[in-house]
Amino acid sequence: MMFTVFLLVVLTTTVVSFPSDSASDGRDDEAKDERSDMYELKRNGRCCHPACGGKYFKCGR
């Protein structure tokens, strides 16, 4: 009986984890793109981060 419950929990956990892995791929790629944009702006001498005091209002957005 305990083995059956254990097996059910393991299978349920495995099935539930697959959709969440594939859903995060698109969001992760989008976040990487934003980071690369920020680094490019930083190399050009512009800072789009709010901590910079809003010096640059046209930050490629």
From Swiss-Prot:
Coiled coil: none
Propeptide: 18-44
Keyword Signal in record: yes
Tissue specificity field: Expressed by the venom duct.
Keywords: Amidation, Disulfide bond, Secreted, Signal, Toxin
Residue list for modification Cysteine amide: C59
A cellular component term, taken from the record's GO annotations: extracellular region
Cystines in this chain: C47-C52, C48-C59
InterPro entries cross-referenced by the UniProt entry: Conotoxin_a-typ
Molecular function in Gene Ontology: acetylcholine receptor inhibitor activity; toxin activity
Signal peptide residues on this chain, from the entry's feature table: 1-17
Compartment annotation: Secreted
One Pfam family cited in the UniProt record for this chain: Toxin_8
Comment field on protein domains: The cysteine framework is I (CC-C-C). Alpha3/6 pattern.
Protein family membership: Belongs to the conotoxin A superfamily.
Miscellaneous field: Found in injectable (milked) (IV) venom.
UniProt-recorded name of the protein: Alpha-conotoxin CnIJ
Species this protein is from: Conus consors
